[in-house]
Every structure is written in C-alpha cells, then in structure tokens.
Amino acid sequence: MKFARRSFVAACFALGAALSALPLAAQTLGKDYVQINPQQPTDEPGKIEVIEFFSYGCPHCNDFNPLLTAWIAKQQGDVVVKRVPVGFNSYFAMIAPLYYTLEATGDLARLDATVFRTIHAEGNRLADAQSRSAWASKNGIDAKKFDDIYRSFTVASKVRRADQITQAYKIPGVPALAVDGKYLIEGHEFNETLAIADKLVAKVRAEKSGRK
C-alpha cells in the first residue's frame, strides 16, 4: 500500500488477511524491491541504515506506523532506522516541519503516534498554525516555543534536506523503506514490506561482514 506522488486521493485497497508475507527466498530484485541507482550515501557506514519515507498526512503511513514501530524494536544494534517526511503535495509539505519540530523539542517519541491519531482518528489535520499551536499546548509543549521552532531556519533546512533525499531516492509513493542506500521497498502490503526488509537487512549484514 502506498500514497502515490501522482495521486493525492488515497486509493485504499485491502489485500486480505489470507495474504501472508512472501517467503524470504521468493523475494527478488525488480519484483519485491528495486536497486537504488545511483546508490545513496548513508550517515553511518558502519551501520545498516533503514529509512522510512512517510507523511503524517498519509493514511497508509498511519496504518503502517505501529507495525514499523514493533519491527524497529526487534532490530539488532547494527540497524539504524531514520525517517524522512515527504512533501509530495501542499498539505504534506505544510506538515513536514512537524516531525523535525517534535524532534527538536524532545517530544517525538512521546507524541509521534499522537500526531497520526490526531489527524486520522480525530479529524484535526493540523493544517494551520493556530491548530498546530493549540495541539502543542494541549500536549504539554509551550506554544510559543513550538511555533518558533516550527518556523526556524534549522527546521526549514532539515525539511529542504528531506526533499533532496526524497528526490535522490526517487521515491514514488509512501510509505516506502530504503535499506542502506541500496534497495527500495514500496507498494507492498505492510507485513510483506517488513518481511522484505528483514531479508535485505540480512543481505547487507552479510555483505558488510564479507559473507555472500
């Protein structure tokens, strides 16, 4: 499942509980994942970097988030998971700074799921400064501090960098996972996506240790 760059209307489709994750051996280049060309640099070459491309405004990202959170908790210490908010449309671009603002205030871990719930369950899209300030205050963040950080040069720079990364990775839709700057997974059922990620993490781990 994904929110496509070229379609801002969510196309929800269910694959059904009968569809289980693909066997690891069945996951192949060009079918279950694609090779990123050119390969992208990672921030920590000694680690296995996994990037989630997402938006708080994406309904599929909302559904994927708890599964990804559980998956992250199971990873070994050599895996580093990072997240990049995309700006595929005006709404996504408008709320992209929210991720980096919460990161700066130290409230990201506490309020990440709350943002998704606010937008998708409560119907508050946080689409204007007033609603975002009220939301921040309601959730224990000083509204002025929140607003100042949201509009800061630092956050704007991080959002620009996120846009550059999204373009470099040629992300067609969200949610999407990139593994170590080499492999991209998108457009699959969520459990299938994570099963493919497991396979690719193991592949990269073997490559880094000199095994085939």
Where are these regions (language model features)?
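Extracytoplasmic/secreted envelope proteins and their assembly/folding machinery
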Residues: 65-72, 95-99, 112, 129, ...
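Structural microenvironment flanking redox-active thiols in thiol-disulfide oxidoreductases
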Residues: 74-105, 110-136
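C-terminal cap of thioredoxin/glutaredoxin-like
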Residues: 55, 138-212
